[in-house]
């Protein structure tokens, strides 16, 4: 019976060793997972920093060269994006270069002839105001779009036309005194 007890004790101690070695193996595996997780997070963090062009000066020269190449590539992509935005804003997307403006008088102010004129889309609305001042030989002229609101003089005529055109014409009403509240 002593042999049986000794073998049981050996098997129990062996199983404890297996369990302890298994837990060591599991803990090593968990540590590796944690290290990989930390490494992955650090890599993601460094990628984000390089996208923001915040490069750490303490890194090795190889990684800094790679980041500089990445930053240069991102700058090129930003420049191409700006160029495409500028080309689309200059009317290369099919929008007309000049738009039709229809003038309507309000009240006792004289009407101008012709009542329809063309203007470039990139001009500010102040150009229309100065045109009316010259044409009517008046200093104070109040302009309204579609008889509803007075645009800011710095507003782009092309933007106003895109948003408020009626039958491909921007209707500009004008008068010598304030017409609407």
Swiss-Prot record:
One of its GO terms (biological process) is piecemeal microautophagy of the nucleus. InterPro entries: Atg12 (IPR007242), Ubiquitin-like_domsf (IPR029071). There is a cross-link at residue 181 (Glycyl lysine isopeptide (Gly-Lys) (interchain with K-144 in ATG5)). Residues 27-40 have a biased composition (Basic and acidic residues). Its main location: membrane. Signal peptide: none annotated. CDD domains: Ubl_ATG12. The keyword Transport applies. It is found in: Preautophagosomal structure membrane. One of its GO terms (cellular component) is cytosol. It comes from the Eukaryota. Residues 1-40 are annotated as: Disordered. It is a peripheral membrane protein. Keywords: Autophagy, Isopeptide bond, Membrane, Protein transport, Transport, Ubl conjugation pathway. One of its GO terms (molecular function) is enzyme activator activity. Forms a conjugate with ATG5. Belongs to the ATG12 family. Ubiquitin-like protein involved in cytoplasm to vacuole transport (Cvt), autophagy vesicles formation, mitophagy, and nucleophagy. Conjugation with ATG5 through a ubiquitin-like conjugating system involving also ATG7 as an E1-like activating enzyme and ATG10 as an E2-like conjugating enzyme, is essential for its function. The ATG12-ATG5 conjugate functions as an E3-like enzyme which is required for lipidation of ATG8 and ATG8 association to the vesicle membranes. PANTHER family: AUTOPHAGY PROTEIN 12, UBIQUITIN-LIKE PROTEIN ATG12. This is Ubiquitin-like protein ATG12. It comes from Candida glabrata (strain ATCC 2001 / BCRC 20586 / JCM 3761 / NBRC 0622 / NRRL Y-65 / CBS 138). The gene is ATG12.
